[in-house]
Amino acid sequence: MERVGAATPEGDMPGFLLALQSKSRAEAPRARVQEQDLRQWGLTGIHLRPYQLQGVNWLAQCFHCQNGCILGDEMGLGKTCQTIALFIYLAGRLNDEGPFLILCPLSVLSNWKEEMERFAPGLSCVTYAGDKDKRACLQQDLKQESRFHVLLTTYEICLKDASFLKSFPWSVLVVDEAHRLKNQSSLLHKTLSEFSVVFSLLLTGTPIQNSLQELYSLLSFVEPDLFSKEQVEDFVQRYQDIEKESESASELYKLLQPFLLRRVKAEVATELPRKTEVVIYHGMSALQKKYYKAILMKDLDAFENETAKKVKLQNVLSQLRKCVDHPYLFDGVEPEPFEIGDHLIEASGKLHLLDKLLAFLYSKGHRVLLFSQMTQMLDILQDYLDYRGYSYERVDGSVRGEERHLAIKNFGQQPIFTFLLSTRAGGVGMNLTAADTVIFFDSDFNPQNDLQAAARAHRIGQNKSVKVIRLIGRDTVEEIVYRKAASKLQLTNTIIEGGHFTLGAQKPAADADLQLSEILKFGLDKLLSSEGSTMHEIDLKSILGETEDGHWVSDALPTAEEGSREPEEGKNHMYLFEGKDYSKEPSKEDRESFEQLVNLQKTLLEKTSQEGRLLRNKGSVPIPGLVEGSTKRKRILSPEELEDRRKRRQEAAAKRKRLLEEKRKKKEEAEHKKKMAWWESNNYQSFCLPSEESEPEDGEDESSAQLEYEDPDSTSIRYVSGDVTHPQAGAEDAVIVHCVDDSGRWGRGGLFTALETRSAEPRKRYELAGKMKDLSLGGVLLFPIDDKESRNEGQDLLALIVAQHRDRANVLSGIKMAALEEALKKIFLAAKKRKASVHLPRIGHATKGFNWYGTERLIRKHLASRGIPTYIYYFPRSKAAILHLQASSSSSGQLVS
């Protein structure tokens, strides 16, 4: 190891450099691992590429001579398989059986599990996840049988169950997406630092994002003895001027080498098809310009007051970005009646450009990943795709588990044109190499998130060239946000990959606020020079380049024309410069245009205030355009005109209601179709009963029901003492009823335990239905439970009524009477068809304030009065209770009127 800081006198060295020099004098011999060795020890299902094998050797070397390291390979280069190969090396070569702990985001938990099973089937892997009860069971199992190699869990669960996980002596701790540790004061950083760990491995495709403090936080985690938390200021002070001091830059580069390995696709995956990146600028519609101006004028205090809070300016920035995306993101902007049409496209310069772009890509046979920051914008894009008839899948933060997996599977196996994704939700743990085009509808403030998102398509396994297209609003805040992101992205490239640095000391917060107020003025001179639309047509072929049979032809880059820019040759990152000075400030003309707007707004306010037509609220300014309209005297309408307006509004409201209902039904049908495909792919068969409306009752009507009710012997509820799980039935089938919630988590005690003793089916069927999202309020699962014991005649079945809701905070509602009534109707149909009797416990008897009288009336109305033999069981707690119930059972029919 080359000595770091050798040119600096020892008296002037910070503690971390002295400690590093002392450590470098005693280095362990280098590990030598060949792929055939790994195969002999249990590696299967993969052929490691040369750089991956090199990475495994580097990890093994770090394990021998350090406390930890950072594997910072670019996204898509196989950090997961290198990590698993390290486990195989430790178990096979060193007889180190672990345990190894892996922490990762929930979105990639299943991916880690699948990769472990595929690459290292000889290593036992426990997935530690689920609700509190499930994890409690897992804890008991792990305590009783602690022999496992790998435990896989998420950050959140690790924090919840830290005391349990701390009890294990971990051989290796792996933290995936380790930028979660960039703040050494965070709870996760502090908690994991308390674990007993021999070796820590951090995996991140974005090891440097913003500052030297974040870099030091990662170093202090993997080597706390060398990089103590107290020395962070020394570290920042020593390297804050590395842009000017080449010796400091070289020193930091050498300091990082033993602890951080970073490879990029362009260097090691040369066989990977080329990725080219292009920025296309677009204009704004007149409607967008109107609201862009209005947003800037809405809160003048944020600009005029030097002590303005950053949160106000951030809100203005957020609103401006929404305006550049689409004005319909604001309530009340979309014209009534709400009917989809070309107005959706023409209202936004960005969507107008996307419309032309997707038409071009569709005609050439390309497939697209379409990213946006905002789920509301994804809703508009989804409406647009429906309008144009393009096939699509969608994943955002609300899509979980199996639905997410099914969407990815569908896109990979079917000719679906577009995959809609939110950048944060779709940027991690997804392999979407079926697409060859990535479009960023809008850009993330953090360029690393966009890089991760683009890596969903440009990664190992991609066999086509990939085109990354970014849409930027010309002369808007989007343009300067994009420019600022360009310099931020240089941190990773320069610090890790080049040894040259652009990272200086952080600016004070007040300066950052002032800078933000200036950013919001960017481009105003050109943008507001006219009120009309600045949208224009562009030649997409000349901008994007040649395409043949759904493949991008990347032999040569086209000449960029107005509206677009191609990456400069040799640039290896998402953002690029245009040959201009990318200063972070607006021009002199932009500032003058902003001042003119402010003066105009003040004049307007003073005028309207003097006329008594406006009540001014401090810090609140009306939207320009709406104020002018409010100062005009309205014409008084005649009674006929008022009536005509009322009718038009009624018709518009009815039409809007009808369209919304049609949209809702269409959405439900699409979701149902998607669920059916998911069930089919998992070989799942639902045991839910159909509704009363969907199954005719062979001509039964109210009169026949009334006639049956008049026979007291056949229509009364029969109250019995005993165990409802062993129904007192004759030769007929018996349906046992039990109420559950919609969580899919089987309960403990009482009837839950009694049913589980009777049969293995209830828990299995119920939990599977929960996993497959087959539990909804009012639903009924019906299935036989004669697997352990059965009667000589007749079959026993269990009907699980979903009558309670359990929310994410684990708060359980009471029994919902509407759901119970809906379920009883379904049970009636099933019992009538089977000529079965129905057996119920005293539903809700232990619930305080529960309406048993109302429940009893529902049971009588939908079961007993319609000729279904109905029994309600009182479970005896003592001999006295049995005698009492037996004595009163003969008169039980008179308990309810």
Swiss-Prot record:
Ranges for region Disordered: 558-577, 611-673, 689-713
- GO MF term set: ATP binding; ATP hydrolysis activity; ATP-dependent chromatin remodeler activity; DNA helicase activity; histone reader activity; nucleosome binding; nucleotide binding; poly-ADP-D-ribose modification-dependent protein binding
Q: Which reaction does it catalyse?
A: ATP + H2O = ADP + phosphate + H(+)
The residues covered by the Helicase C-terminal domain are: 353-515
Q: Which Gene3D superfamilies match?
A: Leucine Aminopeptidase, subunit E, domain 1 (3.40.220.10), P-loop containing nucleotide triphosphate hydrolases (3.40.50.300), Tandem AAA-ATPase domain (3.40.50.10810)
Q: Where is this region: Regulatory linker segment (RLS)?
A: 603-637
Domain Macro positions: 704-897
| Activity regulation text | Adopts an inactive conformation in absence of DNA damage. Binding to poly-ADP-ribosylated histones activates the ATP-dependent chromatin remodeler activity.
The answer to keyword Transcription applying to this record is no
Where are stretches of biased composition, namely Basic and acidic residues? 562-577, 650-672
According to the UniProt entry, the note on domains is: The macro domain mediates non-covalent poly(ADP-ribose)-binding and recruitment to DNA damage sites. Mediates auto-inhibition of ATPase activity by interacting with the N-terminal ATPase module, encompassing the helicase ATP-binding domain and helicase C-terminal domain. Binding to poly-ADP-ribosylated histones upon DNA damage releases the auto-inhibition by the macro domain and trigger ATPase activity. Does not bind monomeric ADP-ribose and mono-ADP-ribose fails to release the auto-inhibition of the ATPase module by the macro domain.
Functionally, this protein is described as follows: ATP-dependent chromatin remodeler that mediates chromatin-remodeling following DNA damage. Recruited to DNA damage sites through interaction with poly-ADP-ribose: specifically recognizes and binds histones that are poly-ADP-ribosylated on serine residues in response to DNA damage. Poly-ADP-ribose-binding activates the ATP-dependent chromatin remodeler activity, thereby regulating chromatin during DNA repair. Catalyzes nucleosome sliding away from DNA breaks in an ATP-dependent manner. Chromatin remodeling activity promotes PARP2 removal from chromatin.
For this entry, the protein name equals Chromodomain-helicase-DNA-binding protein 1-like
Q: Which organism is it from?
A: Bos taurus (Bovine)
